[in-house]
Design a protein with these regions (language model features):
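Short, hydrophobic/amphipathic alpha-helical packing segments
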Residues: 54-61, 116-120
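Claisen-condensing/thiolase-fold acyl-transfer catalytic domains that form or cleave C-C bonds
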Residues: 76-192
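Short amphipathic alpha-helical segments, especially helix-boundary/capping motifs
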Residues: 31-39, 63-68, 96-101
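Short, flexible active-site loop motifs that bind/organize anionic cofactors or intermediates
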Residues: 47, 65, 109
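Phosphate/pyrophosphate-binding loops at sites that engage ATP/ADP/AMP, CoA/4′-phosphopantetheine
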Residues: 58-76, 95, 129-130
Length: 192
């Protein structure tokens, strides 16, 4: 597992990506929990896949595609919550997205599961490489709760942001390349 975070400024000036559509899909599916006083959470094993993650991410995806009258070929990028490498690849396959549309967002292959930060970190990574007027299909997932789905369209303002981030070494790919490994003893010191 990993930890991470991403921050975005929302507003009406210098927009780098416009939100075109969104929707939510939820149910009471307790697949991941932490009881009061427990240091680490528990999960329901295989139940976490099909009735939880897949149901919600596919449900939100289908709703958004129907709502926008679009199909996967209409998008340049696909971002799916990535608790592991298998789940988003399988959902993308079921929906009809290509591996080329999905690959730039699969940070899980490099940093592990960043939990609730996953889709936002992936959006930041995609915005680092996208061009103006490209569409991004994005679906988050919150264990036991549901999924939120979004359609973004990049603008010409994105280019100036990319240049500024490159100068200050703030691109997601650069930050991943500059990682620092810690051994088990260092890990224990950092977590206790």
């Amino acid at each position: 597992a990993a930890a991470g975070g991403a921050a975005f400024l929302l507003g009406s000036d210098h927009i780098v990506a416009k939100l075109l559509a969104d929707n939510s899909y939820s149910s009471d599916t307790p697949d991941f929990w932490r009881r009061d006083g427990m240091r680490y959470p528990s999960h329901a094993g295989r139940f976490t896949g099909e009735p939880a993650y897949y149901s919600h991410v596919l449900g939100a995806s289908h709703r958004l595609l129907e709502m926008t009258k679009t199909n996967p070929a209409d998008y340049d990028y696909c971002i799916l919550h990535s608790p592991n490498g298998k789940f988003p690849r399988e959902v993308a396959r079921r929906l009809g997205f290509t591996s080329a549309q999905l690959a730039p967002s699969l940070l899980v292959d490099y940093i592990g599961n960043a939990y609730s930060a996953t889709t936002m970190l992936s959006l930041a990574a995609v915005l680092d490489i996208a061009r103006a007027n490209q569409k991004i299909f994005m679906v988050s997932y919150g264990s036991g709760a549901g999924s939120d789905a979004f359609v973004w369209e990049t603008t010409k303002e994105l280019v100036s942001l990319q240049k500024a981030k490159a100068k200050t070494k703030q691109l997601v790919a650069y930050q991943i390349q500059q990682k620092t490994y810690v051994d088990y003893v260092q890990f224990l010191k950092l977590t206790h």
